[in-house]
Every structure is written in structure tokens, then in C-alpha cells.
């Protein structure tokens, strides 16, 4: 099976242009970050991009409006990465309805406890918007079983610990953990931690069904030319499916 390539971008004024470029250069699913004032799960690069977007006046309304008008330019599925506070403030039902109407495939909600995600699934599954499960590598096995048994779309494995050694290879324990999750999962299991280079991709693709690249993509959209970004995306894509 081909491996999933899931790049992350911050929802900003270049949202549609950046997402279109990614979708034309190998992205299978694009994660669109919704800027938030207190992004507890974000690293420094994404946090800074979020602050910039807030300064530009970017809101969830702006993102929905752009997706409504121009989402058809994005040639692959896209998910929103948002904190629960934004959904709560918008109104849960209205939010899910708007996601459905703007073609959003799913939601990644990093601060959402498993129990609350279950309630949202029960209440709003008829909108067809998937709630993507996050599994931290520190989560105990029983909890993982519970999360995985209700997973939809794909499972996003994350970790807060240092994940790459001196040689840039991923810790064997992480790989074992991904394999144990895959053994009980009915959806793809993707890795989303510290992946920056084709070398990282080559290492982690042995076990994962796909990869998420966040900070590195955000960094490149900030400082690279369009041509350089395309070249980077091609190198990731080739490594992933070679």
C-alpha cells in the first residue's frame, strides 16, 4: 500500500495557494492549522506561525470562507487541526456543519480527551467529519486499545520526548510501539514527530503507514522559494514510496 504523506500548514492568508501547491506535489491529506492564542501542543515554529496568522487577522471564519470559495482547488483531502476551545466558542453543531459544507475530511483536536471525542462522535457523526485519534507514545497499552478501537480516518502517533538519536534515527522503542498499534488498528497509523528529512522518512516508513511533516514545511513556506519547496516535497515523496 502506498504510504500517506500528510504535510501541515498554518491557516494564513496564503492558505489556498500553499495547500494547492502541496496537493499538486504528492500530499495525500493536508493538515490546516487553525491559529489559536494558547497552542499548548505546538512547537516553537508552528507557534510563531500561529501568532503571525493572528496578527494578520486570521480566524476560523476566514479559514472556512476560503475553503468554501476555493477548496475545490485543493486536489486532495484536508483536515483542520484546531483546539477544542475554538469549536466550543463557535458552537459544536455549527462547527461540524460548517466543516461538512466546506469539504473538511476530519478534525485533529490535540487537547480533546478521549471521552469527549466519543461524545462528539456520537452526536455529530452524521455530518461525516472524522475525528482523528491522537496516540502519545507515553500512553499505556489499555488506553491505546480503547483509543484505537474507536479510531476513524487515520491514527496520528505523537510524542513529546526526544525522538531522534545522534544519527537522526528513531528510537527502536518508538518503532515497536507503532507496530503494536498497527497490529490492532483498522485504519492507517501515521507518525508525526520530528520528521524533517528524507533520511527520517526512510527510517520511519519501515513501520508507519504514513508520515506527518509539520514544522519543517512551515519553515520552508516561510523562507524558501516555490521551486525549492517543490524540490523538497518531491524528495520526501520519492523516499516515502520508493
Swiss-Prot record:
Its EC number is 4.2.1.20. One of its GO terms (cellular component) is cytosol. CDD domains: Tryptophan_synthase_alpha. Pathway: Amino-acid biosynthesis; L-tryptophan biosynthesis; L-tryptophan from chorismate: step 5/5. It catalyses: (1S,2R)-1-C-(indol-3-yl)glycerol 3-phosphate + L-serine = D-glyceraldehyde 3-phosphate + L-tryptophan + H2O. Tetramer of two alpha and two beta chains. The alpha subunit is responsible for the aldol cleavage of indoleglycerol phosphate to indole and glyceraldehyde 3-phosphate. This is Tryptophan synthase alpha chain.
